[in-house]
Amino acid sequence: MKASEIRKAFLDFFAQRGHSVVKSSSVIPHDDPSLLFTNAGMVQFKRTFLGEEKRPYNRAATSQKCMRAGGKHNDLENVGRTARHHTFFEMLGNFSFGDYFKEDAVEYAWRFLTEDMGLPREKLYATIHEGDSEMRLGPDEEARGFWARYLPADRILTFPTKDNFWSMGDTGPCGPCSEILIDQGAHVGCGKPDCRPGCDCDRFLELWNLVFMQFNRKEDGTMEPLPKPSIDTGMGLERVAAVIQKVPSNYDTDLFAPMRAKIAELSGYRYGTDPEKDVSVKVIADHGRAAAFLIGDGALPSNEGRGYVLRRVLRRALRHGRFLGLDRPFLSEVAVAVMESMQDAYPELLESRNFITRVILNEEERFNETLDNGLRLLQNEIRRLRDEGAGTIPGALIFKLYDTYGFPIDIITDMARDLDFKVDEAGFADLMEKQKEQSRMHWKGSGEREVSEAYRQLSAEGVSTRFVGYDTLSAQSTIAALVRDGQAVEEAPAGTDVEVVTSETPFYGAAGGQVGDQGVIVGPSSRVIVSDTLKLPGDLIVHVGKVESGRLRVGETVRLEVDQALRGDTALHHTATHLLHSVLRRVLGDHVKQAGSMVAPDRLRFDFTHFAAISRDELAEIERLVNEQIRVNRDLQVREMNLDEALKTGAMALFEEKYGDRVRMVEIPGFSRELCGGTHTHRTGDIGLFVVTQEMSIASGVRRIEALAGRRALDYLGRQQSVLHQAAGLLKAGPFEVAERVEKLLANQKQMEKELEALKSSLTSKRSADLLEQAEEVGGVKVLVMRVEADDPKALREMNDRFKERLSSGVTVLGAHQGDKAFLLVGVTPDLTSRVHAGNLIKEIVKTIGGSGGGRPDMAQAGGNRPEKLQDALDLARKLLRERL
């Protein structure tokens, strides 16, 4: 049975039992700041389990895209080395939100595995929670009883909390687990006579985990039974496919066959003939899948957070490609094999094919360049270490090459061996462990606001806010809750900061890149200045403000009034953003995708994918086309419809947004169509004017445009014109002559700088000739030890070069100081390096000025922070040279 058939059979099985088949959420959990990646099927239902979000169904089934690389769940280093570890995988799961519980969950799992999948009943085991005295919980006898309907007692095993109890955090929903295992036979395992379920080998393979969410763990650790227990299950598709297809590893399933075939075609290597090269094939296949799905869901390579993990995944695959002889870009072709093989389940991959392959190819080219730079650095450092007499490559250098340049450790080790160098493996391992710890502790999430317990409680009680701000900027409503410092309160006196929740509001809560509204809330005896508005999960809109006067109370009827001018300016910028997005795709190409945005009353910022700097002509064309659409003055059309219906119209859905079944489509007829919950103008002509103020690169393959619309754009052009006229006045030229006049001034300045450098060089040459007359002879060798005037080490080097031009044979030791810094330089002509080593000499004298340094046999530099000891250092150099010459 193919993996695609297993996936379909699973979803069909649960659909027939009243489950809603829910589409996989993004592998990037944009609405959960606690997670780096979606790592389990329950992630998209987390707020439902917490009672913060209601769904139109109470049982669901999914095949969820998951990623485990970075953060707490990190399988990256094990990938390719084991039969089961992956960075990207699919998790099959069924869920109950207060509907069925243990009895049905056990029955469904048993029937699917034994009847639909045909797994042998006599090979299956089940585990249950053995209980926990600290949690005051006994063994899960209820689950044991249900399993006893299908399994003999000796194949129902108890395991401790660390294996068979699941919790969402230190507090909140939690409960015991049951795992289903299959005995694959003694030939698969470790061969030990006492091998049994729980052994680390693959004989007793964990297939399916059933979590019985039946408790709410309180802050004091007590377990309170949930009023509506729930079910969360997970089974890896790759793992169950390996069992059903009777292959030794997940990588031998049909899921990975297209990638293995493509790698064989590109490299000429036949999988299964060399264990070490097989590891590389597995790594490339796995990482190619991960990269395709990550980029498809909106991740881009960068040096932090999710983008950094993606970059590491890509570069790890590329390094393994080199082990197979793949020196040219190849991973984008493996990614195409992924997309084509997964198109039935994930058609969105093929839709983004050009974009995904372009991102990967761009990163491959950058990596090859980086690898070349790293190779040069390694060669230079080995040369320096040899000159200094060192025999070991430091761990810090290895780590820099590995972390900064993505340099393969094997290449470093091989080069070291060829040159009779050792490698500081312990130092490198220590730095790697520190990096892993920092990755676990300090990864950057999605930046979403954490929801306080007060709001979780409100959601659980069914409190929500109805937004009426599309149609009106003022409304009357009732105060449903007041929150101060994360705690719900009954009232808020004058002068206090407060967060206000009402039953309905015209205030737009920050979402989709648009900032929250500002305005006032007026009560019977109070007035609140609203400085921001937030949209929280569970349809809660929170007004953040300060009580200006009076006392605000829960239950009061209040008047909510949005600042009309600010809302209007925000609307202009939001509609302008839609125009800009559409124009960018027309001018630059369909590969342009939104990578982030900010829409405010005073400006807009739009981040998008593009792989080259935007030329001045392109930028002018972008600005012209946006303004052309403004002048056309098109009517905006806003419609609500089903998500599938909207997508069929070609509406653009943004990967960072989470959409419900009903969506709002904003259309500028004939020009733009996007899913958007923000506020807009009625006609494009309302924008008036659009001006780009800045364009820049913010990451590899990501550009940013900042722009102004409406009166803000007009103000900007007015200020710009004022500055232009001021500059024209200073230059005594007309406004249109300013650029030409500045070009002439810059050309004159450049010529004068060249003349100045020539004069300096002439003076230095003359000074060098004068100083050279003061050289003394020591043992038949000309030696110049002197304190000179030089602003920095570079000037000192230039002076030394002048001496070398005039000295056919000799040694120079020069010293200079600038402020609280002292500089030393030792130069030795090639014929004398066997008698005087510049690097060794400078190490001996630099200690005098409280510094350090080194260098080659013929030239070395050093610096220190005790300039008052400079003459002592020079005297020591003179003394040492007399002894050695």
UniProtKB/Swiss-Prot annotation:
Its cofactor is Zn(2+). InterPro entries: aa-tRNA-synth_II/BPL/LPL, Ala-tRNA-lgiase_IIc, Ala-tRNA-ligase_IIc_anticod-bd, Ala-tRNA-synth_IIc_core, Ala-tRNA-synth_IIc_N, Ala-tRNA_ligase, Ala_tRNA_ligase_euk/bac, DHHA1_dom. It is an enzyme of class 6 (ligase). It comes from Syntrophobacter fumaroxidans (strain DSM 10017 / MPOB). Belongs to the class-II aminoacyl-tRNA synthetase family. This is Alanine--tRNA ligase. Consists of three domains; the N-terminal catalytic domain, the editing domain and the C-terminal C-Ala domain. The editing domain removes incorrectly charged amino acids, while the C-Ala domain, along with tRNA(Ala), serves as a bridge to cooperatively bring together the editing and aminoacylation centers thus stimulating deacylation of misacylated tRNAs. One of its GO terms (biological process) is alanyl-tRNA aminoacylation. Coiled coil: none annotated. GO terms for molecular function: alanine-tRNA ligase activity; aminoacyl-tRNA deacylase activity; ATP binding; tRNA binding; zinc ion binding. Catalyzes the attachment of alanine to tRNA(Ala) in a two-step reaction: alanine is first activated by ATP to form Ala-AMP and then transferred to the acceptor end of tRNA(Ala). Also edits incorrectly charged Ser-tRNA(Ala) and Gly-tRNA(Ala) via its editing domain. Its EC number is 6.1.1.7. SUPFAM superfamilies: Class II aaRS and biotin synthetases (SSF55681), Putative anticodon-binding domain of alanyl-tRNA synthetase (AlaRS) (SSF101353), ThrRS/AlaRS common domain (SSF55186), Translation proteins (SSF50447). Zn(2+) binds at H574, H578, C676, H680. GO terms for cellular component: cytosol. It is found in: Cytoplasm. Keywords: Aminoacyl-tRNA synthetase, ATP-binding, Cytoplasm, Ligase, Metal-binding, Nucleotide-binding, Protein biosynthesis, RNA-binding, tRNA-binding, Zinc. It catalyses: tRNA(Ala) + L-alanine + ATP = L-alanyl-tRNA(Ala) + AMP + diphosphate. Binds 1 zinc ion per subunit. It comes from the Bacteria.
